[in-house]
Amino acid sequence: MSLVPVVVEQTNRGERSYDIYSRLLKDRIIMLSEEVNDTTASLIVAQLLFLEAEDPDKDIHLYINSPGGSITSGMAIYDTMQYIKPDVSTICVGMAASMGAFLLVAGAKGKRYALPNSEVMIHQPLGGFQGQATDIGIHAERILKMKKKLNTILSDRTGKPLEQVELDTERDHFLSAEEAKEYGLIDEVIDKKK
């Protein structure tokens, strides 16, 4: 069971209490601080769409501290980030690994950040399947297509040649915040809020 802090705000009508994430949402901040799965993807997509409806011209800030997770769930978030009108700024706090790293690089170019002691990890898709040989073949073909798609997007968003991205994602590839900047996964390492 996770504990969610509550903040109390004074208004002219008295006190109002919010869970911390609702309060951050008022400031157009979304937190991805767990595994990427269907539930977290639905929550983040809903928050992105809500904030776009509130003000389509104001940036949204997605803070990421995630070990990664489901490719299809992550692609739902990625596609929504690209679909909506506001720029989505991404900020790595802690670790952005696997699909977490993919979502970090998916932020608006020029607005992708990491705190100084953050880490980023990229790698190829993971998967497992059991069943009949024909079905295993179908799933193996699907994961290879996903690998190609993810690497192509990473190449486009980092400016690295596809061949380099394919080589670097063959195994777990850990990068410090500065290395992530050099690689093109982020645009700037920040230590103070602007």
Curated annotation (Swiss-Prot):
Its main location: cytoplasm. The keyword Signal does not apply. Keywords: Cytoplasm, Hydrolase, Protease, Serine protease. Transmembrane segments: none annotated. It comes from the Bacteria. It is an enzyme of class 3 (hydrolase). One of its GO terms (molecular function) is ATP-dependent peptidase activity. GO terms for cellular component: cytoplasm; endopeptidase Clp complex. InterPro entries: ClpP (IPR001907), ClpP/crotonase-like_dom_sf (IPR029045), ClpP/TepA (IPR023562), ClpP_His_AS (IPR033135), ClpP_Ser_AS (IPR018215). NCBIfam families: clpP, PRK00277.1, PRK12553.1. This is ATP-dependent Clp protease proteolytic subunit. It comes from Clostridium botulinum (strain Loch Maree / Type A3). The lineage of its organism: Bacteria, Bacillati, Bacillota, Clostridia, Eubacteriales.
